[in-house]
């Protein structure tokens, strides 16, 4: 149980450091681009799967 507390503490410290630093704005822009790229890949995969089954 103490292991999980330490892991979550480290994750929270890293998230806080990145959130309060200047990296947050750049990371948000990159995350938006990656979201739309993977959304497009999902749609292409679903269409290819539907065509393959038909």
Swiss-Prot record:
Q: Where does this protein reside within or beyond the cell?
A: Cell membrane
Q: Which InterPro entries match?
A: DUF1328
Can you name this protein?
Answer: UPF0391 membrane protein BAB1_1670
Q: Which parts pass through the membrane?
A: 5-25, 29-48
GO-annotated cellular components: plasma membrane
- What is a single Pfam family found in this protein's UniProt entry? DUF1328
Family, according to the entry, reads as follows: Belongs to the UPF0391 family.
Is Protein biosynthesis tagged as a keyword? no
Keywords from the UniProt entry: Cell membrane, Membrane, Transmembrane, Transmembrane helix
Which domain of life does this protein belong to? Bacteria
| Native species | Brucella abortus (strain 2308)
Main location group: membrane
């Amino acid at each position: 149980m103490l292991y999980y507390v330490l892991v979550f503490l480290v994750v929270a410290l890293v998230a806080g450091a990145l959130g309060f630093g200047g990296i947050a704005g750049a990371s948000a822009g990159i995350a938006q681009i990656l979201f739309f790229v993977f959304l497009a890949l999902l749609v292409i995969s679903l269409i290819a799967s539907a065509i393959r089954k038909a």
